[in-house]
Structures are given as structure tokens and as C-alpha cells.
Amino acid sequence: MNSIQASEVKKICLACEAGAGSSLMVKNGLIKKAKKAGLDVEIVHAPATQIPSDSDIVVCHTGLSGAAKAAAPENTVIVQFTMFMNDPSLKKLISDLSEGNEIFSS
């Protein structure tokens, strides 16, 4: 299971399937929550098959986790969610980042 210390996270990629509205809502929600928590992290959006190689964490819907794992660099942390709004795993990610915790792949 991959992990990363919160202090090492510089870039989070929200992986999507087609770039439709739902994944953009998740990205914008993450940006808003990260800003509110005072986090200095870049949050980008990319197709699950084209994860930027400098991504420290990839956030994706469970249905895209296989494609995201295949496209992401080997040690990248993959955080999966099931609900596009108010998913507990996304809340935990922001909480772990702001508290300086170690973040694990889900």
C-alpha cells in the first residue's frame, strides 16, 4: 500500500473519465476545502489514463481506480471516492493534509 507524508504533497490530480461536470465539481470542492484549510497544494484535473507524472496523490471514483493505477507513477497514492458530493474519503484527505498525517492509498 502506497503512502506519503502530508508535508511532501505538492500536487493532487483528480482523475476523471470524460471531464464532465461531476469530476469538475469534485475538483472545485477540493480546491475550496484546501484553500479554507490553508493548504499550499496544486490540484489539477486529468483523464484517468493521462495522470501527470509529478502527481503525488491521485483522487478518483472507485470505477476509475484501475485506469488511474495503471497510468499513475508506481508509488503514487490513490485515494478513491464513491460519492461526488461530501464523500468521507475526500474529507479525510483534506483533514490528513491539514493535520500533517501520513496519507495512504485506499
Predicted regions and their residues:
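Short glycine-rich, flexible loops that bind phosphorylated cofactors or substrates
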Residues: G21, G66-A67
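Short, hydrophobic beta-strand segments that form beta-sheet elements in well-ordered domains
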Residues: I43, I57-H61
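Alpha-helix C-terminal capping/helix-to-coil transition sites in glycosyltransferase folds
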Residues: S53-D54
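Short, polar loop motifs at secondary-structure junctions
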Residues: A46-A48, T62-G66
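Short, conserved loop/helix-junction motifs that constitute active-site signature segments
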Residues: A71-P73
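Ser/Thr/Gly-rich flexible loops in soluble cytosolic domains mediating phosphotransfer, phosphorylation
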Residues: I12-L14, V77-S106
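Conserved active-site segments centered on acidic
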Residues: N2-A48
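Fold-independent oxyanion-binding glycine-rich loops
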Residues: E17, H61-T62, F81-T82
